[in-house]
Design a protein with these regions (language model features):
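Short, polar/charged alpha-helical segment
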Residues: 17-42, 159
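Paired acidic/hydrophobic, glycine-rich loop segments that form the ligand-binding mouth/hinge
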Residues: 65-69, 169-170, 185
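Contiguous mixed-secondary-structure segments that line small-molecule binding/active-site clefts
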Residues: 29-32, 60, 70-167
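Short helix-initiation/N-cap motifs at beta->coil->alpha
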Residues: 44-57, 153-156, 169-182
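Residues at or immediately flanking beta-strands
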Residues: 7, 38-42, 148
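Extracytoplasmic "Venus flytrap"
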Residues: 7-25, 46-50
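Short, low-complexity disordered leader/linker segments with a strong preference
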Residues: 1-7
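Surface-exposed patches in mature extracellular/periplasmic domains of secreted proteins
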Residues: 41-46, 69-70
Length: 185
């Protein structure tokens, strides 16, 4: 087979079973088929190209063409995006989707472009809400006192957890397992 004329790279820090990766893999197949093999999208999962912040920086530098990322790391590059991360601003996932579909996603995309941060958003997805997972039950805010809780590397999440009385531990998602093993969390 002939070499592709264009090779693009996509990265995420999730497993190959995660919906983001599955979607990018399907997109890669569609691109290959539609271009008759002239365009190839290489899809890297499991943080092979880095965790979310490194993926975003890779897109900025041009070493990565596409990535999926959470709002936490993303908001560090375009701060007004953080409004979507504010605690309890959405009632549920349907509420978030209605807001994004109302035109907010286009306004956010325009804002990102205006910031000239070196990347654009191709779309918005809901990756789920934020929950606390602990070894002991949490019935009230008092139960969070001094618990070490992993948060994304973003001031909105760090401040929220600290204001609830817990101790925010900012780190990439892929570092959680070893942090649990070593007692960091």
């Amino acid at each position: 087979a002939a070499e592709p004329r264009l090779v693009l790279r996509s990265g995420d820090d999730s497993t190959e079973e995660y919906p983001y990766h599955i979607a990018f893999a399907a997109w890669a197949e569609a691109i290959d088929k539609a271009s008759n093999g002239e365009i190839k999208l290489e899809v890297y999962s499991n943080a092979v190209l880095g965790y979310e912040r490194e993926l975003i920086e890779g897109v900025q530098m041009g070493t990565i063409d596409f990535c999926t990322t959470s709002l936490g790391p993303f908001g560090s590059f375009a701060p007004q995006i953080n409004v979507l991360s504010l605690p309890y601003i959405f009632k549920d996932v349907d509420h978030l989707i209605r807001i994004l579909d109302s035109g907010l996603s286009y306004k956010m995309n325009a804002y990102i472009e205006e910031q000239n941060v070196g990347f654009l958003s191709l779309g918005w997805i809901c990756g789920g809400g934020r929950c606390f997972y602990t070894k002991k039950p949490v019935y009230s805010v008092k139960d969070l006192a001094n618990l070490k809780i992993r948060v994304m590397e973003n001031d909105v999440y760090i401040n929220m957890v600290n204001l609830l009385g817990a101790k925010a531990v900012p780190m990439a998602y892929g570092e959680v397992y070893s942090a649990l093993q070593t007692g960091v969390l």
